[in-house]
Amino acid sequence: KRAKALGVHVIDRCNLTVLMEEGFEDTAAFLAENNVEVIASMPCYLEENVDSQRGKGVFNASIEGLKLLNRKGYGIDGKLQLNLVFNPQGISLPPSQCELEPAYKKELKKRYQISFNNLYTITNMPIKRFGSTLLSKGLFDEYMQLLKVSHSEDNLAGVMCRTTLSVDWQGYVYDCDFNQMLGLAAGLSLDKAAGAATVPDNKT
């Protein structure tokens, strides 16, 4: 609410399974009431693929979360935006966003009557758990080389750190969500931006 009051376009990186957990039943309604754009990870539209990556039951909980968002008006038209994210597994780059999005829309609609607005394909950064996995399998250098040879200056204008900030649950601000994963705060918070507080030195 405070961010919206500042005239900021707010995006919620939503864990779909949380929407169905006890104590969070009103989250979807809150997001809709405040016209918050929702972005959620959905690695596949097939149950066996998702559960093999995220754990048993994650797919069905995610589907129920998407259905709930649809009931609140998300993904139906252009007003309440519901966008999904695809991340590839292993040392590979994501497929064409333009080619994958129609398949997602077709399958989720046919199988579960779910609608969404856009599908974003994101290349994995070799950090945190993914980076550790690459190192343990001896694939880190190979993946870094793949990123290097696949570099395209055409992509630079669209990188999210040029137009967005990430904010964690405590209000700390990061210049991209990858730096948020690494705990590298940008040195300010929503409170500080509003002139109300400062970020502790150990968070800068």
Which residues fall in each region the model found?
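Core AdoMet radical
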Residues: K1-G23, T27-L66, N83
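Short, electropositive alpha-helical surface patch
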Residues: R2-L6, I91-K109, Y143-M144
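A structural motif corresponding to the C-terminal end of an alpha-helix
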Residues: L6, G65-Q81, R111-S115, W169
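Non-ligating segments of multi-cofactor redox enzymes
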Residues: F59, L68, K72, I122-F130
